[in-house]
Amino acid sequence: MPIIHLFAPSVNFTICAVRAMMVTVMKMTDKKIKLIALDLDDTTLRSDASLAPETAQTIANAVKSGTQVVIASGRAFKSLPQSVLQIDGIRYAICSNGACIEDMHSRTRLLSFTLRPQVVERLLETFSGERFEAFVDGQPYCDGEYYREPLRFGCSPAYIDYVKTTRIPVDDMPGFMRRHIAELDSVDIMCGTLEHRAELWEKTKRLSDVYVTSSSPRLIEISAAEAGKGAALQRLAQILNIPPQHIAAFGNGDNDADMLAFAGLGIAVKNASKRCLAAADYICPTNDEHGVAITIEKLLTSN
């Protein structure tokens, strides 16, 4: 299927203006969309990590229409934004890059894949001296220095408050990871610079039985081999008995590419990574241009 671009050239516009300016009015799919999977950061959320009121309302409208809306994030469960969680009717959350699926109604985990202890030991040996984040039972813990000075490790200024309000700092992360060696949903390695990231990425080839991805130039994210948003979405779709052709997925990062490839309709925001764009069927306006809201409205109209 050719990639269709669904964005207007101007970045200063309202949703109504975008509707008038959109060059593509074709029906996006001939299949009824029953499930919409949403990546959050830099996709559904704006670049300042906030949720636009227009986007929140459109998601709520989708839920009210009977469409299953699923969060699909690299974030740990306990760091998901309240602005999204408070939208009534969202039940399932794929978290930690697909390492777990949370049922927020029953407050249980449907599925969970933790890193194997021998993998964690190999990881600590391979990346000795690096700064880590570790997710345990949905709670993110991070290196104490990173918590105190996130900018020094490449954190965006817009995400400083996110780090401070969601992470629990630990000064001895390797020791912490060993104490919780059988409980780790996933581990992030702080890169700081693109050059250092390239060096660390090369080292990941020494690991086996892992899923390695990245949602940000400052992070390398490592989970169990069974993880991945695409694999998790496939498992959830099987539980809900929804075929891929009735699924739409939105994303922006490398860690979203497999999810977009699995969905019958893979949609990348215009600001997405090259790998994510390549996996998409459609490209919509950026996260700061209400791309998710605009496209969901089109999907609801098509439905």
Residue ranges and their predicted role:
Residues 50-155:
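Active-site phosphate-binding/coordination module
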Residues 29-35, 51-52, 220-303:
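Mg2+-dependent phosphoryl-transfer enzymes with acidic/Ser/Thr/Gly-rich catalytic loops
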Residues 34-47:
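Asp-based phosphoryl-transfer active-site loop
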Residues 130-131, 135-250, 254:
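Conserved acidic, metal-coordinating active-site core of Asp-based
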Residues 1, 21-22, 26:
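Methionine residue identity
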Residues 4, 11-13:
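Short terminal hydrophobic/aromatic SLiMs and anchors at protein ends
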